[in-house]
Amino acid sequence: MLYVTYRMTKIAINGFGRIGRPAFKIAFEKNDAEVVAINDLTDLATVAHLLQYDSSYGTYARKVEFDQENSFLIVDGKKIKYLSEPEPENLPWHDLGVDVVLECTGFFETKEKMQKHLLAGARKVILSAPPKDDTPVFILGINEHEYDSEKDNIISNGSCTTNCLAPMIKVLDENFGVEKGFMTTTHSYTNDQRLQDLPHRDLRRARAAALNIIPTTTGAAKTVGLVMPHLEGKLDGISLRVPTPVVSIVDFICTLKREVSVEELNDAFRGAAQEQLKDILAVEEGQLVSMDFKGNPHSAIVDLPLTMANGNLVKVVGWYDNEWGYSNRLVEMAELVGNKL
């Protein structure tokens, strides 16, 4: 699904980590979006190094330099203002003409906190995570048509897992009717976990990420109920964090309103991948493993050989690059928001 804007959308990225950096790389290739500023508390030299070299995705094809004296990150000769301001209200968004802030720090997850970007002069804010309050959530391919530029100044792009799960459920629900379901995501570890055993508010996440399968919570299934309200309260799930650096997989089991066959299910996904959810959802017919999906831009890649059906009880499985795929949707959401300014 391609969102083309008819104006140049000026983007600022707040937080230049595992989502901020790929979002920058994706936006840098757009003709209708421009990253004009990056704000992160890390020093500029380190930021430039981490943008150029990535353990998961390899060396960035663009040349990365920096101007320490004038505080610019320079990518293929293009200068991007670099800031290290901890308080969003003090950022120069007005002076830089920022249209959309991508809030990627993981620290500002409520309207009250994100409002500070608007006070600083930004026109819109998109959170790259599920919100901690009633901030509206929009998922491309699901409910983006409900976005109202007149009132939706602060929105959430949901989580990587919700962006994978929701299109899968949409196909099932529109073709067969979903009654209720449970989801398990086998998810690559993230920086919210510990490299070695160390205190954490979640005692399981306190354990060494590279040595354990770590059961933990996820709000992804419940968030689907926010963007598909008729399913609210009917979905839930857990996450299993595993010792892989990137790419995750959702296993969704549900009951449908009628009995179906595996072929009916897979045909529905094939059709959606070619039409309604093109560029959002894809299908895979081969015998692949997680690293085969690294760098895949889709929200969900349904693994058709893993589909199962027993009457109206079904299992469907979808892969997703929890960094690159999600970051594509984040930038596309910024394009959509920018187009409606």
What feature does the model see in each segment?
Residues G237, I249-L341:
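C-terminal active-site/capping subdomain that shapes the small-molecule cofactor and substrate pocket
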Residues R241-P245:
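AMP-binding (ANL) adenylation modules
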Residues L73, F138-L140, I154, Q196, ...:
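Short clusters of hydrophobic/aromatic residues that line enzyme substrate/ligand-binding pockets
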Residues N175-S239, C254:
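Catalytic core of tubulin tyrosine ligase-like
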Residues N14, R18, T42-A45, L96, ...:
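Conserved active-site and cofactor/substrate-binding residues in soluble primary-metabolism enzymes
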Residues Y6-A206, M308, E332, K340:
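N-terminal Rossmann-like NAD(P) cofactor-binding subdomain of oxidoreductases
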Residues K151-D152, A208-A210, V247-D251, L313-K315:
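Short, solvent-exposed beta-strand edge segments and adjacent coil->beta transition regions
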